Amino acid sequence: MSVRLVLAKGREKSLLRRHPWVFSGAVARMEGKASLGETIDIVDHQGKWLARGAYSPASQIRARVWTFDPSESIDIAFFSRRLQQAQKWRDWLAQKDGLDSYRLIAGESDGLPGITIDRFGNFLVLQLLSAGAEYQRAALITALQTLYPECAIYDRSDVAVRKKEGMELTHGLLTGELPPALLPIEEHGMNLLVDIHHGHKTAYYLDQRDSRLATRRYVENKRVLNCFSYTGGFAVSALMGGCSQVVSVDTSQEALDIARQNVELNKLDLSKAEFVRDDVFKLLRTYRDRGEKFDVIVMDPPKFVENKSQLMGACRGYKDINMLAIQLLNEGGILLTFSCSGLMTSDLFQKIIADAAIDAGRDVQFIEQFRQAADHPVIATYPEGLYLKGFACRVM
């Protein structure tokens, strides 16, 4: 008999709506013993079967659901089915948009909670973010090797969130050949170098692909400021859109060096690209005090909030940085501003920008809305999957 997690009375509603998480407060008791990450059955207070998931005894998310089908076992065949289902959408998208790199598995939204897999050419980069994902590592890798024999598999499970569930950070080649130090990929007509070994996330921010493309419509003959530029994807796109100048700002010299290489790789005019290593908050104030002006500003900061206790501070940070950006824009200028914080709702982010405009003494029109690219789907029963939001704003 399998180990069972029994829900408290009345706490089954979210599972009946196929939400993939069970929080600790919903648990009445455990029947049997399960190790960290082991697969368990989840039942209501009367013993009615609801789902099968991965158990994490110390996490606020006590179980993450693998399946709502009682006949489905969690094994190599299960992972193969999920991978093949996800691949169908990515195949269509890659052909339609001319991509060689994309998110293959987007965690819960692809029915594989705690698992992220990005494909860069013939390299699969894996992040296992939960105890259940780690417990199923061998089965998942076997399924990947069978379905993608042409691909090497590289582990980037070196993210701090693993520590919350008592797991060590892991990093390195799992199968196949070692990726080059910098791997060229293609995105909307751009060639970009990505660092699988040490780059942010799995190597690159694939979720901003469509936002980078959208930037081009705003930048012709414009002066652009690219804040938190990382390896210059927005900068390359701005140059391809015909900007007169783009200034890229980041605290990482290594990222800026790759950004410069990306401009050169695309045979764009390097004299129109400036790379500044500095703190964005500090530099924006310096630019304001010097009277610098820009026509377009891209504001793509890292996540400001990890948990609810940090939300108020994050709101202040987002407001301050957007206020400074609005102050630096010429009349009619465009602010492309983003938040990748899952706890920051689109409505709250829009209000923060409105408050920033008031503090800056400017009027702002919202003219376009952004979200993560289509290879990062959001399943309808898991709204938390929509983490990236952004706006194009016209500053009066």
From Swiss-Prot:
It catalyses: cytidine(1962) in 23S rRNA + S-adenosyl-L-methionine = 5-methylcytidine(1962) in 23S rRNA + S-adenosyl-L-homocysteine + H(+). InterPro entries: PUA, PUA-like_sf, PUA_sf, RLMI, RlmI-like_PUA, SAM-dep_methyl-trfase, SAM-dependent_MTases_sf. It is found in: Cytoplasm. The keyword S-adenosyl-L-methionine applies. Its EC number is 2.1.1.191. Specifically methylates the cytosine at position 1962 (m5C1962) of 23S rRNA. This is Ribosomal RNA large subunit methyltransferase I.
